[in-house]
Amino acid sequence: MSNDESLKIETATLREKGNGISEERLKDCNVLIWWGHKAHDEVLDRTVNLVQRRVLEGMGLIVLHSGHFSKIFKQLMGTNCNLTWREYGEKERLWICNPGHPICEGLDPYF
């Protein structure tokens, strides 16, 4: 993706000042991809609040594996996000809530 000149891709890490996330950086962010594994509690509450505000303003958020237990995901979902595992052969359906968002281009209304 970094070869696509229409995209501006940046990274932010836990160890950077403010976890590498500021109002200024988020202002121009269309989609934030969040990956976290074990250090969820080390993410600053201020960072979580900044990201939540931008998501509520319309910024896209893609939370990757293990991010289900991140502070931002739990705050946005309003639950503790504890998971259990089961195998019942059930299907899960995902609905596109904002089909006009560029990240949804080419996707069916649900899958």
Model-derived features with residue positions:
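Short alpha-beta junction capping motif
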Residues: 25-71
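A generic short-segment signal for beta-strand/edge and adjacent turn/coil regions
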Residues: 1-4, 32-33, 63, 97-102
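A general structural signal for well-ordered secondary-structure junctions
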Residues: 7-8, 32, 61, 82
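Aromatic-Pro/Gly-enriched surface loop or interdomain linker
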Residues: 1-29
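An acidic, glycine-rich "communication" segment
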Residues: 64-111
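Detector for Asparagine
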Residues: 3-4, 19, 30, 49, ...
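Short conserved AdoMet
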Residues: 2, 56, 108
